[in-house]
Amino acid sequence: MTRPIQASLDLQVMKQNLAIVRRAAPEARVWSVVKANAYGHGIERVWSALGATDGFAMLNLEEAITLRERGWKGPILMLEGFFHAQDLEAYDTYRLTTCIHSNWQLKALQNARLNAPLDIYVKVNSGMNRLGFQPERAQTVWQQLRAMRNVGEMTLMSHFAQADHPEGIGEAMRRIALATEGLQCAYSLSNSAATLWHPQAHYDWVRPGIILYGASPSGQWRDIADTGLKPVMTLSSEIIGVQTLSAGERVGYGGGYSVTQEQRIGIVAAGYADGYPRHAPTGTPVLVDGIRTRTVGTVSMDMLAVDLTPCPQAGIGTPVELWGKEIKVDDVASAAGTLGYELLCAVAPRVPFVTT
């Protein structure tokens, strides 16, 4: 028998999350973002559940080719564009839409020998300061691209740095307005947070990512609790050991948790080698046999300990939800000082996945 830990994916929930995105941005088309192997869910496992999308957005050329080979004929947007000039041959073959964010890409595209023009997303730096042309250069770049024989349809894109704040896109929108003054173009600006909370930035295409998987772009579940979005992934395991401890005994490496009175502790087959956060402190929420309780002590490589006081009936084989429909990944991440994004992306290869 295999270890009892597994990650279950509810693909019907993913379909529902996409429908919620469409209701949030009814006038825009949707790029479903499946970068980082679909945020750790597995692009080959989930892409068909997003089949009603208008396009897929990602980074990895191999994953884009996989989607084409699986039968996806719609648009595919490469969010960071091509990394080497020779990649343009594959972009041409598989008809990929490329982001252009730097001068060397302009030159490579101009010099490429393509069978047909590629659709282009021109990235403007609106304050994130990662990729993109400065706003004052945007129109010059736009005109350079418009003159190239290798360029098809063009869209202006940017990425908001603070869309999870109520006033978080004001300065970015000012920069974008400066960049596009007098320019007639399509726009793709909204990430997950802007899709939910800034309808003035929806324009032509929105790019939801984390919300498709049922986690919060702000890192706080309460911020999306009333949207109807639900978690797609449930990471679960079982209790494989029980200890009844007396006052003064300690649990785990370093003895970080001290028992104050007689207490039953359950040992769960899950640890940081599975992707559970090592820095999750005592008190991190967990569900045992449908009852909310807490972790105790330090998370080990392959195991963690939970307090069985609220669930005295629990024993060997009792099911444990580490995160999912009841224990939100955002809440586990918050306890561990990180984000749900990281935990979803970090589920280890040794954890088996099942889809429903």
UniProtKB/Swiss-Prot annotation:
Q: Which GO terms describe its molecular function?
A: alanine racemase activity; pyridoxal phosphate binding
Q: Which residues bind substrate?
A: R130, M301
Classification via PROSITE patterns: ALANINE_RACEMASE
Q: Which top EC class is named for this enzyme in its record?
A: isomerase
| Modified residue annotations for N6-(pyridoxal phosphate)lysine | K35
The processes (GO biological process) annotated in the record are:
D-alanine biosynthetic process
InterPro entries, alphabetized? Ala_racemase, Ala_racemase/Decarboxylase_C, Ala_racemase_C, Ala_racemase_N, Ala_racemase_pyridoxalP-BS, PLP-binding_barrel
Asked if the keyword Nucleotidyltransferase belongs to this entry, the reply reads: no
Q: How is its activity regulated?
A: Inactivated by D- and L-beta-fluoroalanine, D- and L-beta-chloroalanine, and O-acetyl-D-serine.
Listed under catalytic activity are:
L-alanine = D-alanine
Quote a single Gene Ontology cellular component term: cytosol
Q: What is its EC number?
A: 5.1.1.1
Alphabetically ordered keywords of this record = Isomerase, Pyridoxal phosphate
- Which is an annotated Pfam family here? Ala_racemase_N
The record's similarity note reads: Belongs to the alanine racemase family.
- Tell me the protein's name: Alanine racemase, catabolic
Q: What is the lineage of its organism?
A: Bacteria, Pseudomonadati, Pseudomonadota, Gammaproteobacteria, Enterobacterales
